[in-house]
Amino acid sequence: MIADIHLTHLSYTQLDTMTWCATAQVRESLCLSFDTLWDKASWSRLSVFNIPPIAPNKFCALNWQYYTAPVTLSARKIAHNQRQLQRTGVRLLLQALISELEISDTLDESNFPYRLINNKYYVCFSHTGPNDKSLNSNVAVIISHHRSAGIDIENNNVAWKVAQRFYSDNEISAIQSLPTTQRDIIIKLLWQIKESFIKIRQYTLAQGLGMDYAYLITDLLDALRDPSPVVVIANRQSDYHIAFLPIQQTVVVY
């Protein structure tokens, strides 16, 4: 068996004349290798059942059914495999976005923030694990011609106790007054905004999560009522814009 990594549910969004993002689901499936099957086929066993040898040119035309033996992996191995899947997935998505934009370029990973070698566009990745027991992950990428940008895709909610540990006092006070359903969404959106700014500003995790974005909460609540596929919020305390893509569960700071 050969692992085949591919993207599904691709979505491309142009945020302005110099900024584009893409999201997708990355899947890993198993596919048959003709060479492996042919080399390992036990014709001696087939002869026991009076099954004649099969010519190579007819081998692939057969209606094959195959099964894989169940494999028990450690939690560490599963996490490693998922990280590898996500790493490959974001780079496949970058290539898809580059192709969509009709750009001929490759990624320079020698410094952060990442940039395209020829066009010098800024690149930022994000990925998130599944919110169920499947092995699928969601991935996201942003390309900005103007300046460094941040992106965060997140399937899972952020626990209230985690927010209480990292968020500012102003944020906690404002969040506590919200109904539970709104509270959970705002906690998650703030987390995604913080993650995006961490990628832009190169904050440490604790420093970035502790930044105070309480002034954005009213605008975020308004954004939740907006049915648009992309909702853009002007950040009053910087010249960055914040885009919320609800269907893709993605936040972009650009």
Regions from the PLM with identified roles:
Residues M1-Y254:
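Core catalytic alpha/beta fold that binds nucleotide/phospho-ligands
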